[in-house]
Amino acid sequence: MNLTDKVTIPTQVMARTVGDETVILDLTSGTYYGLDPVGARMWQLMGEGQTLAAICDTLLDEYEVTREALEGDILRLTEELRAKGLASPA
């Protein structure tokens, strides 16, 4: 995936926040994945249909981080979610 891509969240995937953690669960396979608050914000923006580049721009305004580090984090999280079947390229 690259930063111009958007992410699709399958209909069988649900997310719930418990305390400071957001848990993503695939109801069909039982696969789950935990997100910290920054990862949860990325997930929220992915669900809004934004490109990964737009998500990066939004998060740069919200967190003190370099663009390079954030782009790497976004691409890494997206790839982990894709590998687990919790998200796919749109």
Predicted regions and their residues:
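Long, charge-rich, low-complexity alpha-helical segments
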Residues: 31-90
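Acidic, low-complexity/disordered tracts enriched in E/D and polar residues
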Residues: 1-40, 44, 90
